[in-house]
Structures are given as C-alpha cells and as structure tokens.
Amino acid sequence: MGSKSQQQVQVTPSASAAILVVMYIAAFVAAFNENIINVALHDIMAAFLVSAITAQWLVSGYMIVTSIFTAIMAFLSGRFSTRKLLFFACGCMVAGEVLCLIAPSFSVLLPSRILQAAGSGILFPLMMNVVLSCAPREKLGLYLSLGGACITLGP
C-alpha cells in the first residue's frame, strides 16, 4: 500500500539533521528564485526589447508552473522515490538557472524560467514530506514551521 516515498526510513539523528538542512536550503533557494526576477524586470525589458506585458510572463509563467507541479506532487510522490524527485527538482532548478544566465534572447529566457519553476513546484511539497519522514514526532511542529519559514523568508 505504501509507496517508496511514503515508507518510513530509519536514519540517525545526525543524518536527519543534514537531510533537513539540505531541504531547508533548497526550499529557501526555490522561494528566492520565485521572486528575484521582479527586481530585474525593467532591465530584462531593456536588454531583450520586450514590453512589460511580455516580460511579466517570466513571473506569471513561473507561478503557474510552480502551482501545477505542486498540485501533481501527490501523483509524482506515489510514482517516484523521494531521492529521484529531489535530484530531478534540483536538476531542473540548476539547469534553468544556468540557461537563464546564458539566455541570448527572451525566447530562451522564458522556457528556462519555466524549467526553474518545475523544480520549485516539486521542492516545496517534497520538503514537507521529508520533514514528516525525518523529524522526530515530538518536534514535528517545530520542523514544519522551520520549513515554512524558509519558504517565506526566501523572497
């Protein structure tokens, strides 16, 4: 009945702490990526000679794709292991960031940003799943709150 991602894995307290720190950092970076583009929109419009409406798709597209991937995480977590999802999400984010960095045109920048969003959409709920798996039951509220704080403080 339980999938790979739902099974309780026994790890040492130090390994749990390391896993949680990695997940918190990943969630912080994902949240930071979500909003960092806002301060650069004017420069992007000038560099790529696009209108404000077109440039705004960097923000809107990111939010839409993040929402979609967050919504389908229940399906994905039932099909793939937490490790595979984490590597896929981080891979999407890193690949998207590198492609955004070297994007020669807006038509390359937008899909690169969408790739980042796919990673973020997976990372947010994945972090909560990992916290539920790794955190001690008596301190679950604290660890879930820390995860939420990382997402909130990212921007």
Regions found by a protein language model. Give the residues of each.
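Transmembrane-helix bundle of Major Facilitator Superfamily
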Residues: 2-155
